[in-house]
């Protein structure tokens, strides 16, 4: 058996090498012709020390031997003392960047040049063949869907229209945590990862479907096992969108699923769409039955009711399904990750809790809960969330940008087709930008003049919500969700390490940037009992 496997592997390798050699030499001739003029004046970004690209495959062998890839890349950049690098994976120049000046040039000055996305089997499957928005290459489909998102779903008017749904879920979150403090066990130990992730999922599902759960909720208001599996599948898709699969750089490997990513994505899609698609299909039938006269109550109604110039549905059923899935993915991870990390850090620095509660009590008092109208006055609370975005980003890199033409960035030549990745870790923890970059210090974000703190970072010293032509169009929603989640948890409860633990272990997971262990913390109500029942 082992001999057969070895023989098949050898045959595959020989076939692959022959295919790649022909493609490589053909592409090299084209690249040499197109790039010759610019390359005479500007070099490629530096190759990290110790890396020498192999013919055809580049540094793919090193990538495959050094997992997780994002930690390998950041280690190479640190050892080479560079804020921009060029790592060739097969015939693709991968360019990680951790300098805010270069990042601003990419996302602001040259955002039109870097306005497309890389192709991968994961993004193809998740977007139903590139018919959505965030992960879709630049083109007419992207323009169409982005217009729908910005003008119909995320406009200021629509944001206000959906306020009650967001507040309902914030109220539900507080009741759920309160129930954990008063359950039969009486322990008050709360799984904050579960609470924060499901709050975010519940908010976006309420906005899209006008419902919290696809299955029955538990007696304490929490999610069922089926609901937890659904949300876990959403997070698994986020983990594998741009996971440095070999097939992302050598297209002929797609379908072989050598690293198992394709199966994981397909399984996640099957699970999530098992819950989402029947709701969407039933709603479409309802609209058809009412002849397009249904009064909209959520974003799904809006998507279905859109018409083109001839009065026909603007979006196909697949476009609606794909966009709904993408909106859910876009909403769940950033706020929940920031809140979990911030509370973990603050448990180890209790004086930060005290300062945040003083602000909350001064603005909100103790006879009601935090409302969205309060958020603009909660500068220290927002500084705590902002610091979590800086120090503990949800992903190591921003969504990759692909250069649509040869260009230069910071006196470096960036060939057409390069994958440019802004490092959230490298920017937010850059010692050339931040004092004590590895310390959680919310006060660094407070302004001397007392002006309002915002979660966005226009100078790209860190990335909370991306900017530019392919930037995050939901930063207002993301800010509301993040600050409301965090403020409700801080205002309603005190938080401590569980009994027999003096501190929270802040170790990162090896393969991602979440806490290595989900945050379990001891919660105690700090408001009058009647406030929790609203």
From Swiss-Prot:
Record-level GO BP terms: secondary metabolite biosynthetic process
This protein's UniProt keywords: Glycoprotein, Heme, Iron, Metal-binding, Monooxygenase, Oxidoreductase, Signal
Domain of life: Eukaryota
Disulphide bridges, residue numbers: none
GO MF entries: heme binding; iron ion binding; L-phenylalanine N-monooxygenase activity
InterPro entries xrefs: Cyt_P450 (IPR001128), Cyt_P450_CS (IPR017972), Cyt_P450_E_grp-I (IPR002401), Cyt_P450_sf (IPR036396)
Cofactors, names only: heme
Protein EC: 1.14.14.40
Binding of heme, residues: 472
Keyword Glycoprotein: yes
Region forming the signal peptide: 1-21
Residues the record marks as carrying a glycan: 500
Main enzyme class: oxidoreductase
Annotated family: Belongs to the cytochrome P450 family.
Function statement: Involved in L-phenylalanine-derived cyanogenic glycoside biosynthesis, including prunasin and amygdalin defensive agents. Catalyzes the conversion of L-phenylalanine (Phe) into phenylacetaldoxime (PAOx). Cannot use tyrosine (Tyr), tryptophan (Trp) and valine (Val) as substrates.
Name recorded for this polypeptide: Phenylalanine N-monooxygenase CYP79D16
Gene: CYP79D16
């Amino acid at each position: 058996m082992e001999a057969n496997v070895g023989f098949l592997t050898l045959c595959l390798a020989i076939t692959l090498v022959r295919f790649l050699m022909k493609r490589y030499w053909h592409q090299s001739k084209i690249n040499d012709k197109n790039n010759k003029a610019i390359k005479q004046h500007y070099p490629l970004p530096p190759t990290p020390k110790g890396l020498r690209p192999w013919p055809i495959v580049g540094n793919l062998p090193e990538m495959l031997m050094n997992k997780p890839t994002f930690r390998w890349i950041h280690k190479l950049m640190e050892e080479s003392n560079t804020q921009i690098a060029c790592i060739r994976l097969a015939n693709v120049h991968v360019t990680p960047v951790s300098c805010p000046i270069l990042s601003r040039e990419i996302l602001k000055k040259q955002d039109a040049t870097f306005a497309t996305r890389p192709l991968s089997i994961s993004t193809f499957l998740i977007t139903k063949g590139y018919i959505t928005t965030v992960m879709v290459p630049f083109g007419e489909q992207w323009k169409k869907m982005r217009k729908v998102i910005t003008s119909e779903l995320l406009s200021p008017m629509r944001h206000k229209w959906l306020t009650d749904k967001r507040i309902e879920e914030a109220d539900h979150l507080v009741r759920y945590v309160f129930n954990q403090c008063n359950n039969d066990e009486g322990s008050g130990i709360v799984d904050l990862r579960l609470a924060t992730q499901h709050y975010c999922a519940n908010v976006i599902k309420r906005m899209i479907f006008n419902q919290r759960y696809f299955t029955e909720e538990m007696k304490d208001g929490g999610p069922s096992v089926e609901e937890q599996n659904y949300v876990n599948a959403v997070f698994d898709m986020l983990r594998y969108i741009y996971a440095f699969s070999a097939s992302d750089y050598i297209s002929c490997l797609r379908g072989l699923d050598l690293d198992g990513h394709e199966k994981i994505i397909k399984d996640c899609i099957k699970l999530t769409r098992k819950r989402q698609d029947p709701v969407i299909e039933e709603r479409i039938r309802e609209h058809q039955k009412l002849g397009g006269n249904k009064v909209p109550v959520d974003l799904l109604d809006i998507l279905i009711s859109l018409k083109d110039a001839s009065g026909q549905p603007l979006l196909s059923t697949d476009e609606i399904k794909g966009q709904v899935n993408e909106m859910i993915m876009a909403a769940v991870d950033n706020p929940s990750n920031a809140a979990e990390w911030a509370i973990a850090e603050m448990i180890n620095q209790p004086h930060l809790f005290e300062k945040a509660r003083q602000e909350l009590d001064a603005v909100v008092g103790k006879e009601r809960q935090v409302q969205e109208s309060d958020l603009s006055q909660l500068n220290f609370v927002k500084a705590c969330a902002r610091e979590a975005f800086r120090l503990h980003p949800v992903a190591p890199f921003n969504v990759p940008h692909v250069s649509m033409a040869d260009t230069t960035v910071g006196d470096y030549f960036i060939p057409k087709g390069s994958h440019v990745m802004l490092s959230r870790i490298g920017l937010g923890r850059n010692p050339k930008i931040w004092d004590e970059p590895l310390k959680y210090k919310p006060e660094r974000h407070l302004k001397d003049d007392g002006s309002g703190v915002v979660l966005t970072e226009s100078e790209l010293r860190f990335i909370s919500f991306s900017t530019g032509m392919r930037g995050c169009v939901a930063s207002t929603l993301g800010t509301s969700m993040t600050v409301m989640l965090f403020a409700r948890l801080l205002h309603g409860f005190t938080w401590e390490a569980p009994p027999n633990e003096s501190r929270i272990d802040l170790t990162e997971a090896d393969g991602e940037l979440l806490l290595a262990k989900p945050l379990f913390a001891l919660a105690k109500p700090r408001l009058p009992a009647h406030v929790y029942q609203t």
